[in-house]
Amino acid sequence: MTDFPVRATLALIACLAAAQPAAAQGNRPIRLIPGTDSMAAPERVERGVRNDGVLAPTERDVAGILDFATGALPATLWAGSTRKTLDPLIGAVAAGRYASIRDIVRRALASPASPPAMEPGEKLPDFAASRAAGLLRIGETDAARQLATRIARFQPEDTAHAVLREALFLAPDPAPACEQIRATAALAGQPDWARGLVVCQAVAGDLARARLGLALQREQKIAADDWLQRLVALLDGAPRALDGAKADLRPHHLPLFAAAKTAPPVAAMSALSPAMLASVAANPGFAIETRIRAAETATASFGADGRALADLYASVSFQPREMADLLAFAAQEQGPRSRAALYRHVRSQAPGPGRASAFAQAIQVAEKRGVGRAFRRAAIDLVREIPPTSEAAEHAVLLVRTLLIERHTAEATRWYDILKVGAGPADGTALLGPLLFLAGVPLPEMGSSQTLLAWRDLQGRLDPPRAQARVRMLRSLLDAVGARALDLEDATDPLPAEPSSPLLAALRRTAEQRLMGETILRAAAVLAEPGLRENAAAIAATIRALTEAGLADDGRSLALEAALAAGL
């Protein structure tokens, strides 16, 4: 019997050569890319020759897209670690709760560095290709695409090509992904290549070939892609084709949803990765409400930039009666248009006390709708335009916290200085002092017992049920950055003990050995664990590990982020 990959390749190529162009279709999918009757021959690259950016064999695992000006980590990043240890850690990375951890993981995976050691006889994917796949998993689509592009022309197996293909399918226009499919016909035996080809045929309006491609996949016993089959059927006129689908969506499914001008079902949307959510948000083929919902979720998890969400908010149009009182409309409306109205309400106010007040009102509504974090990030440029004045100081605490979330420490400090001279709420400096200290601002008053005691007393008055937990969190964070808060210590309430966890034990050992790259990946694993990611002692242990591994600034960023997430 003919071997499966050979049969699949021959069948697909024969299908492409023999199939006639699709007939014109009345109510068929919109043609997003030009149709094609033949496959372009794959580009031939001489192995081992450096030509037009092609990597020689000894260079491909070292490939990266950063330099020191753009945040690259040392070239010895992976020294002392092994592929056997690192590959499972890279395979498990996710966007996570903390932007600071995601950023240091991004820098590690995107930095050019000597690869870790491999055991004799180990057969593993290219390390650079594995790093590109990790970048895609944490939602860094552009970085994944750039790194995969660098190595895909040389890579003999499918890992880099698969990453590149998925990253390209996440773009609003599927044409580059389909060009990549056509340029890599040598991979026709790969199931995902065959699925990608069907997607390209379907979005081009060539449903006859798409159906034939699915039939060939069934004949060759390629694992069924339930969503792909359903989406082709939907485009072919079956209105209920999506009913009952339960599998997870993948990047190559999104162009088909856009071509059908339909949103993924709610259950499927809720399970999308940050990269896929950002893709839906950026794709004009989806309805604006769908795009805003996707952007809000992606922005809240730092999977998308807040400015992209701001642009979507700004693109929503309103009736004159709605424009007359956007805040009232937002309070009554429940959907994405309500958040767009809030944004427009804030933007309509001149920078100054009026905008500060409008932002405070908008945040209250956004918090009730469950999108407060995303809305803050979307409105950050509007907040930065508000000049620090005594007239707007009543909102300084909210504005400082918003600025610190996006690391605008200088602007936040100017608002704090306004509070220090007596403007705004009397307890403002006590509330904000520890946050600015964690942000790296040298505050002489933080050396005074009165400042910390005032902060502790405020927590007891403002939120009694959470006061003790917040005091423990601040004590743990200050201790982790090397500034023990003696005035907050209580002999009857010692610092919480570090949880007994194999993840924490492994992180501690790795940091002690100064294995920078492995420490970063293990820190991400700790803070992805549900029982650890909000635990004060676990967060503090992670900060200490990063500091010991030579990443003190990143540890401090994590401390500030954890404090803000805990409501300090």
Residue ranges and their predicted role:
Residues 138, 171-172, 204, 406, ...:
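Structural motif corresponding to the intra-repeat A-B loop/turn of tetratricopeptide repeats
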Residues 141-144, 174-178, 208-213, 409-415, ...:
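Solenoid-repeat scaffolds in large eukaryotic assemblies
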Residues 176-269:
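Extended amphipathic alpha-helical segments with heptad-repeat/coiled-coil character used for oligomerization
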Residues 229-412:
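Long, internal scaffold/assembly segments composed of regular secondary structure
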